[in-house]
């Protein structure tokens, strides 16, 4: 019996070893499964098919053996407690209307009934939008720019409507030099001057949720290719017409500045900023009222109290006085000899050389009459003929000169007679014969100057 029991024990042990090597032990599978890394990631898509939402999960390590693994979600569900994922090659997904979208759900990786790893995830924070589509680029020749437009399915959805888009473009020969532009609309304008001329460009776009919903970038849209037009003139060259206009404008401005600097003080400043006199005198001149009844008239009635002599009258008197200086001393000397000599020599009448006529007074005897000289106008005029009585002329010689001097003097004139008269007799200093006449001339000139000065003062 002992030998039989030992034999059965050895056979049983051999069976266990053989069965373990052939892979039929479930406990060994569990131990090997616990040694692998089952980390995973998930994303949700809302309203992918009408009102249904989808949840997709996948292992981060692509080498994990997923033959006996399953995914299960529990919590934040409507009408059910848990839901199992469907397996599609290397991914697990579920599409249903029973997501509550409020709160967190528990997602686990299971082998049979045993959970290997679990995560708590809020489906509103792992939203991945759908990729944009209908990407196109249109060139506007007038504006020299490119208009980029695209479309997205989230514009008609209720939940994820606000998206941020990322537009990326590059020149075809530059594989890794992408230029990114973020925008919230579905339209973008690219300026031609920011792109290389005659070059091929590739452009694509993707989206990400914004505001309440959070998540990941969507897949890139299909790429679109466009070519930029050629430019006749390179960026380094300049239009000759524009260059000529620029040069002429520069020189014109420089010339104007130089002329303004040169002519500022003499021409421009007096016109723009005229120099004003003293403000007090200017205001006094502007505000002072003129006096009334100013004596600015040249009417003779306005100068009745002034003695006015014309220049011609003064010149005539000067000529007469000069004539008397030459003629009267000779006549006076002869008459003096006749008076002292008695009857030694017969008296002679005045010759034609000493005859005094109105023409000798300046050829204008009417000037004295105009001045109011009545005696001069009534005085007898000496003729060139001899006197009727030469004897009486010898005795009355002084009276003749006295009448002549009286005819020169006037009652209204300010000029005194050139000789001093005492009781009708003309007296002269025998020592200096010309002195009385010179003295009379000096006084006459001073009186004429005073008269003209008073005339200008009154004026």
Curated annotation (Swiss-Prot):
It comes from Homo sapiens (Human). The keyword Nucleotidyltransferase does not apply. Residues 131-231 form the Fibronectin type-III domain. The chain crosses the membrane at residues 240-264. Belongs to the type I cytokine receptor family. Type 4 subfamily. The keyword NAD does not apply. Residues 1-20 form the signal peptide. The IL7 receptor is a heterodimer of IL7R and IL2RG. The TSLP receptor is a heterodimer of CRLF2 and IL7R. Interacts with CD53. A motif (Box 1 motif) lies at residues 272-280. PANTHER family: CYTOKINE RECEPTOR (PTHR23037), INTERLEUKIN-7 RECEPTOR SUBUNIT ALPHA (PTHR23037:SF27). Residues 265-459 are cytoplasmic. Pfam families: fn3, FN3_7. Disulfide bonds join 42-57, 74-82, 108-118. One of its GO terms (biological process) is T cell differentiation in thymus. It is linked to Immunodeficiency 104, severe combined: A form of severe combined immunodeficiency (SCID), a genetically and clinically heterogeneous group of rare congenital disorders characterized by impairment of both humoral and cell-mediated immunity, leukopenia, and low or absent antibody levels. Patients present in infancy recurrent, persistent infections by opportunistic organisms. The common characteristic of all types of SCID is absence of T-cell-mediated cellular immunity due to a defect in T-cell development. The WSXWS motif appears to be necessary for proper protein folding and thereby efficient intracellular transport and cell-surface receptor binding. Glycans are attached at residues 49, 65, 151, 182, 232-233. GO terms for molecular function: antigen binding; cytokine receptor activity; interleukin-7 receptor activity. This is Interleukin-7 receptor subunit alpha. A motif (WSXWS motif) lies at residues 217-221.
């Amino acid at each position: 019996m002992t030998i039989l029991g030992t034999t059965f024990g050895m056979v049983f042990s051999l069976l266990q070893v053989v069965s373990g090597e052939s892979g039929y032990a479930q406990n060994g599978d569990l131990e090997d499964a616990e040694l692998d890394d089952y980390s995973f990631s998930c994303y949700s898509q809302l309203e992918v098919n009408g009102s249904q939402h989808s949840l997709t999960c996948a292992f981060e390590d692509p080498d994990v053996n997923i033959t006996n693994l399953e995914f299960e979600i529990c919590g934040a569900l409507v009408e059910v407690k848990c839901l199992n994922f469907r397996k599609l090659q290397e991914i697990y997904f579920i599409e249903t209307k029973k997501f509550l979208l409020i709160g967190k759900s528990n997602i686990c990786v299971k082998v049979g009934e045993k959970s290997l790893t679990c995560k708590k995830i809020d489906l509103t924070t792992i939203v991945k939008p759908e990729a944009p589509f209908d990407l196109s680029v249109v060139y506007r020749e007038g504006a020299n720019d490119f208009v980029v437009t695209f479309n997205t399915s989230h514009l008609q959805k209720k939940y994820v409507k606000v998206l941020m888009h990322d537009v990326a473009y590059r020149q075809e020969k530059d594989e890794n030099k992408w230029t990114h532009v973020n925008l919230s609309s579905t339209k973008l304008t690219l300026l031609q001057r920011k792109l290389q001329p005659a070059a091929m460009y590739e452009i694509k776009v993707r989206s990400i949720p914004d505001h309440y919903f959070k998540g990941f970038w969507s897949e890139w849209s299909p790429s679109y290719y466009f070519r930029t037009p050629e430019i006749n003139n390179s960026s380094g060259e300049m239009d000759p017409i524009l260059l000529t206009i620029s040069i002429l404008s520069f020189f014109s401005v420089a010339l104007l500045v130089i002329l303004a600097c040169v002519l500022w003080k003499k021409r421009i400043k007096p016109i723009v900023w005229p120099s004003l006199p003293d403000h007090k005198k200017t205001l006094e001149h502007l505000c002072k009222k003129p006096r009334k009844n100013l004596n600015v008239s040249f009417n003779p009635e306005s100068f009745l109290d002034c003695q006015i002599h014309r220049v011609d009258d003064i010149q005539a008197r000067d000529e007469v006085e000069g004539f008397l200086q030459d003629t009267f001393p000779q006549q006076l000397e002869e008459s003096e000899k006749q008076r002292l000599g008695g009857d030694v020599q017969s008296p002679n009448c005045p010759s034609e050389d000493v005859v005094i006529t109105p023409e000798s007074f300046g050829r204008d005897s009417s000037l004295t009459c105009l001045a109011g000289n009545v005696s001069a106008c009534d005085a007898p005029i000496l003729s060139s003929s001899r006197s009727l009585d030469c004897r009486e002329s010898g005795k009355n010689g002084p009276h003749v000169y006295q009448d002549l001097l009286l005819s020169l003097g006037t009652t209204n004139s300010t000029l005194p007679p050139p000789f001093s008269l005492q009781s009708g007799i003309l007296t002269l200093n025998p020592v200096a014969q010309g002195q009385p006449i010179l003295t009379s001339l000096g006084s006459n000139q001073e009186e004429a100057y005073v008269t003209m000065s008073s005339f200008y003062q009154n004026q």
